[in-house]
Amino acid sequence: MKNRKFSNLLLLRLRILCFNKKPAFAATSYAFFFRNFSVLIFIMVPDEKENGAAADNSFSLLIGRGVVLFLFYCPTALKMHGPVPAHWFCDKNIEAIQSDGQIRLLRSGPFPWSHGTCIRGA
């Protein structure tokens, strides 16, 4: 029963890539939607194209390079009225999580708190 509940909480896994002139990193995000809050876990790794090395996305090598985890707790008020703080990761284009599980490409500059994609719990 608990395993089934946990599997229902994991709604979406997506890859986010920031499209700047020289991308600094790629990020993989895991979204967990709980009753009163949501948790986004971002795993960020440096883009090795900057260093001229071949990029290898195997999980063991990512851990060897130093994986940085970011957790974002989204209270009920923010879930209903506020977006994911995407300006932490990219200031141009980003794929955002919508409440129905779809992905939307934003084309604005720095992500404002006044509008954008809301994350809503189950």
Curated annotation (Swiss-Prot):
Per the UniProt topology annotation, the Extracellular ranges are 46-57
Entry GO terms, CC? membrane
Annotated localization:
Membrane
The membrane topology noted for this protein in its Swiss-Prot or TrEMBL record is: Multi-pass membrane protein
Q: Which residues lie on this side of the membrane: Cytoplasmic?
A: 1-24, 79-122
Tell me, in one coarse class, where this protein mainly resides: membrane
Swiss-Prot/TrEMBL keywords:
Membrane, Transmembrane, Transmembrane helix
| UniProt keyword annotation of tRNA processing present | no
Q: Per the UniProt record, which residue ranges are transmembrane?
A: 25-45, 58-78
**Could you identify this protein by its name?**
Uncharacterized membrane protein YOR376W
Question: From which source organism is this entry?
Answer: Saccharomyces cerevisiae (strain ATCC 204508 / S288c)
Its ancestry begins with:
Eukaryota, Fungi, Dikarya, Ascomycota, Saccharomycotina
